[in-house]
Amino acid sequence: MDRILFLDNSIKNDLYKPLAYWEPVLQLDFDSYRASAGDLPHDLDDYSHIFISGSTASVLANADWIEAEQELIRTAVGQGKVVVGSCFGHQIIARALFGDGAVRKRRALDVGWPEIEILADDALLGEAGSKIYGYVFHYDEVCKIDENEATAIARSDACEILAFKLKDRPVWGVQPHFEMGIVDGLKFLELVKGEGVPDRQSYLKSTVKPPKDSGWIIPFMKAYHKARPFQA
């Protein structure tokens, strides 16, 4: 039976509540665990799919819960589960599989609705050469993957590895927040406003890079649910 394990990486009293965005597009029964509070299932036998959420935490922190989640990710990949990580989820998959050097702190916040270039044909992101738009907000980034094991499948002008997929497993890391549309993204900017964070009005007034969203959440999640676990 298909069932999703949703790993909620939000922090106590967090501004970002992942499940509020993702639950409306989850088409299978699911269980949610607060991974950031050390809450993880004892095993993965009940799950075909795993979804790893974003977080306002840094994946570079050497916290016990981050180490435990990385171990779960390695187990899930070894068992052939369908695994998708968004934002922090994208980064923690990379760190779990490719080592600590796979993720680094950016020189500056990457935020907005960039043009996303699809580098390879992919079930979740579409055809190679196509362009889509989606919201990003991240201080850390995936900077290295093992090219023998994974393929970079999307980039932007500000981030060379905006998404990747394992070559022989249904495992994806995707930096953009496709679950957050333009209004959601602007609201989030207002909530976290501070040094280095652009004012939401700057996007509303911009004639050069106004907010643009492709609504990719729908094809993205349809493909996620259709993906099948790997059978050795």
Predicted feature residues:
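N-terminal beta1-alpha1 cap of cysteine-dependent amidohydrolase-like domains
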Residues: 1-81, 196-232
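Short glycine-/acidic-enriched loop or helix-start segments at secondary-structure transitions
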Residues: 16-17, 61-63, 93-96, 146, ...
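Conserved beta-strand termini and adjacent loop/short-helix elements that scaffold enzyme active sites
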Residues: 33-36, 106, 137, 155
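Catalytic metal-binding/acid-base residues of hydrolase active sites
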Residues: 34, 57, 89, 140, ...
